[in-house]
Design a protein with these regions (language model features):
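Beta1-alpha1 glycine-rich phosphate/pyrophosphate-binding loop at the start
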Residues: 50-120, 146-153, 163
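Conserved beta-strand-loop-beta-strand element in the redox core of flavoprotein oxidoreductases
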Residues: 114-136, 171-173
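Short hydrophobic core segments
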Residues: 51, 74, 132-141
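Local cysteine-cluster metal-coordination motifs and their immediate loop/turn environment
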Residues: 1
Length: 175
């Protein structure tokens, strides 16, 4: 049996049996129903902005929320998850797993703003000065491709790997 299958079993088992219980205990002050029950979610540290919702952004947001920060993720695209959602094919990483991870962050109190291109929609200075963020984590990933400057790379129908995967995964484009 391959190690990947064992890792998948453990992750699936954890998600089905332990994840909700663990999230309810985070920080002793946060309960999954705090916002719905009218209780305030207490935060002990400052307010943090996370730019990008790929693997680094999601991990950072989760760790900061567990430590007591008020965290908001700013994602440029319309779907949270970054390369996990648009760059990895479904057969390698089911999108439902990524959606579950994003949902876990929401239960931790993390807020997610999609369609927010920091640098165009808002600047980092505005995040700090006008919105009161104490810290900003920039986890924007590898969004821009490096071209090889070879003949034909600018022709119609020639895509970078990132553009191809984005078109196939988010836009459901047929090639």
């Amino acid at each position: 049996m391959g190690i990947g299958n064992l890792e998948r079993f453990v992750a699936d088992y954890h998600n089905k049996n332990a994840a909700r219980r663990d999230l309810a205990d985070v920080g002793a002050e946060y309960s999954e129903n705090a916002e719905n029950s009218g209780k305030s979610v207490k935060r002990y540290l400052g307010k943090a902005a996370v730019i990008g919702s790929g693997p680094a952004g999601l991990a950072c947001a989760g760790d900061l929320a567990k430590a007591g920060c008020d965290v908001t993720i700013f994602e440029a695209l319309h779907v949270a998850g970054g390369v996990l959602m648009y760059g990895i094919p479904e057969f390698r990483l089911p999108k439902e797993i990524v959606r579950q991870e994003v949902e876990n962050l929401l239960r931790l109190g993390v807020k997610i703003e999609t369609n927010m291109v920091i640098g165009k929609t808002l600047s980092i200075a505005e995040l700090k000065d006008e919105y009161g963020f104490d810290a900003v984590f920039i986890g924007t990933g590898a969004g821009l491709p490096r071209f090889m400057n070879i003949e034909g790379e600018a022709l119609k129908g020639v895509y970078s790997a990132n553009e191809f995967l984005t078109r196939a995964n988010l836009m459901k484009a047929a090639f």
